[in-house]
Amino acid sequence: PLIVVDGVPTDNLSMINGNDIASITVLKDAASSSIYGSRAAFGVILVTTKQAKKGDRISVNYNANFAWDKSTYLPDYPDVPTQLEAALRAKARQGSGSVELFGMYFDQLLPYAQKWKEQNSGKKGYGEMRPYVDDNNVGDYRFIGNQPMYYADFDIQDIWYNNAAPSQSHDVSLTGSSGNTRFFTSFGYNSKEDVMKINPGQRKRYNATVNLQTDITDWLTAGARINYTRRHFSRADSWNNMYQYIWRWGSFFIPSGTIDGQDFRVVAMQKQAARKVLVNDQYKVNAFLKANVTKDLTVNADFTWQVDDFNSKSADNSVYGMNWSGTSPQWIVGQSNTDTWRDNSKMETWTANFYVNYAKSINDAHNFNVMAGVNGENMTYDYFYAQRPELYSLDQPELNLTYGAKNKWEINASTNDRASAGYFGRINYDYKGIYLLELNGRYDGSSRFPAGDKWAFFPSGSIGYRFSQEAYWDKLRETVSNGKLRFSYGEIGNENVGSSWPYIATIGTISASYVGWLNGSNTKVNEFDLPEWVSSSLTWERIKTIDIGLDLGLLNDMVTVGFDWYQRTTNDMIAPGKALPPSVGASTPTTNSGSLRTRGWELTINWRKQFTNDLGLYANFSIGDSKSVVTKWDNDQNIGHPLSTAYAYAGQVWGDIWGFETDRYFTEADFTGKNADGSWIYAPGVADQTGIQTQTFVYGPGDIKFKDLDGSGVIDGGKGTVDDHGDLKVIGNCLPRYEYSFHIGGTYKGFDLDLFFQGVGKRDMWTQSSFVFPEMREADLAIYANQTSYNIYEPEKGIVNISESNAFPCLYPGNEYAGNVTGLAGEGGCHNYYPQTKYLVDMSYLRLKNVTLGYTLPVELTKKAFVQKLRFYVSCNNLFLLHKGSGDLPIDPEMNAGQGALGYGTWGRTYPTTKSWSFGLQVTF
């Protein structure tokens, strides 16, 4: 949605000091948000900052908060023997005679790990590692020749994560009036440390705000709002993504300890990493005039200038310590691989508005309000990047303090700009506040579109009927004190269609490279891409919204109810055009060829009652749901990834996930024997899954059996289209449904309590995360504490454990690939972990999002110290989950990211969702 702060569009709400905010209003229907233009296509959030009123006394407010964070959910490893045994089983099934990580063979490692488990209680924390002495004292590692063997069970959670990462915020403001002038000023500071225990990241923010308003005459008011925000981010810029590597191979490798004081690779890289620093400065100045020309006519003008400046600086340091293999410390990253870089991006924006309001009431019955105006916006953007290798000193990572050859230098730059303008008007009419009418219109232009398609007109309107104000409602007013029916229709144009110049074919440059065969010398050659095909007639996406609503106030508005049903249709969506023949040699250009329809509803119920001067209670509840359907798309109806425009098709519910329906595990009874090549012979009546096997994997007892939905006797995905999808079906949807929240709280004799609950009723996710499936990625060979219940079919060893109570099928390494099912390649996963109903992740949840308990001292006590108000409070965020649909999956249900994509198998290997405890105070002098 578009964020508008004091009438000015803002891209990032986090740049605003929360204590400066006076109110927040959300506009969802097109009729009310259309007046804000093309950037309001998905609603508007109106933020009003604090401003003194005429006659206000001067007061000073101070707010302070101190908090500590920890992770809500973290994965863990089982003991090391369990990890090794799982990897050995998986690789043995693949036909591998040996399993190793950098020379450590798991079958040789297993006896040491078993003895370590017998000789130690629990996991090992960070510290000096003990060498092997004998079988009665195996220590933590053993060097056999030049080959290290690591088998200690390190406590990854304790070593790497801080359970009390500190943060604090302070804010002081001065507000009041003097004569015809009102003012509000504030200064804020916020700092936060992340939960990474080793070389943690830090974030700081500084805010300064000045709001001034003065009556120059009795008819002319002028004002200015000046904001400055600095955000300072600093973190270790290590060679590896730490969250990827600490959860990649196992708790035994790579060790999180030291030998002779030397750290191992991952710890060393984190400790010795340079600090990546990002500084974001935002300057914003807004000046406005309001002229009351007559009693009914006002003229308004405002101008805003904003600069966003981003400066980044970092380096790649050399690293010394114990490497993947070897028995002595070494340069893990040598001096010749060091470098430093800097980049800067600067965005400058100005926005101007001029509008006239005319309000007139006739006979206290007919009320008119007419507004007309014009606005414009212009943005310019510049980017610069420079990098030079081989630092003289790690302590001074500056560009001019490097000695690398010039042919290794890198310099890059780019520039961009866009502009928009619009004429707008609004007419409001009501008759005695009962019959309500509003008409809006905008004529918008954007630089993103070619001549002839830059400008478009977007109308909207709404009607309302306050039936509770009618005479016939008098007898019901004590019960239903307020009632209004609403209907609105509106069109909004969306200009956010990708690049600033999507209708212009551009030639991209390729980083210079050595091409000796082309010029006969070992020098770099400049290269250029072929221009992409573009449509020369791109224009606005048109979003049409219908909204029907009912507002009720019950029992003198002690209870209020609001209900809305809406339909939002997006026409002329930017989408891939019709497929081009392969001989063209270019990708399909995007055109205004798509349509999407969304239908949804929202319900809010609020209750508030003041029982006595000392006791007041309240409760609020809201819930909403929506579903989007693709109604037009140029596609051959190929099914695939749920949120990929490349696979969208007419009739698709946006976010749908395709997959197999899981039947059960195969048992020996499903087969009659084996073929000469080792593949199983399916028993009569059992659908054959041979066609979806890949690599050396062969379905057998203990593996997943899919349902034969089309009755063909063969499990497949057909042609991967809507008309022929074999045994595939829609198994879920990755978009949230039934999002809800409720507040419960009250006040009693100075105490205040507020509990905020928030949740999602239904949401599915298919992922190839290693935290979901054991031995998912062949490069990892990892198994986690939530994955130790799996089938085993090793009759040659006398071990057969196949049970529907086991969480997972027989193990096999490397299941992250695309597989051999047409229609599922875009989603990924194969073997036992093709997309399917059994392992679809349930992301529904109900969370106590926040609980706050406060106490305000009696005024009789505080006024003696010239304090108007003094409040202390304690608060907890993300305290616990009352419902977690994903069960023992060690990932927070609000987690959406990972190192890499969901399909890469690393979902969850990122900064975790956190819970926090805090206390604070609020003082007004």
Predicted regions and their residues:
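Extracytoplasmic gating/loop element in the C-terminal half of outer-membrane beta-barrel translocons
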Residues: M322-W324, S446, V760-R871, C876
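Extracellular/periplasmic, surface-exposed regions of secreted and cell-surface proteins
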Residues: L2, D6, N211-R230, D263-D316, ...
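Conserved small-residue
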Residues: N61-G145, Y385, T591, R608-G732, ...
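Outer-membrane beta-barrel transmembrane strand signature
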Residues: Q114-T175, F184-S186, N190, G257-N292, ...
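Soluble periplasmic/extracytoplasmic beta-strand elements of cell-envelope proteins
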Residues: L2-D6, S23-L27, V44-T48, N61-N63, ...
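Membrane-proximal, glycine/serine-rich, low-complexity loop/turn segments characteristic
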Residues: P1-L2, S32-T294, N357, N367-F368, ...
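Short acidic/polar hinge/loop motifs at secondary-structure boundaries
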Residues: D6-S32
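Short, glycine-/polar-rich solvent-exposed loops and beta-turns at beta-strand/coil boundaries
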Residues: I16-N19, Y36-A41, P200-Q202, S238-N240, ...
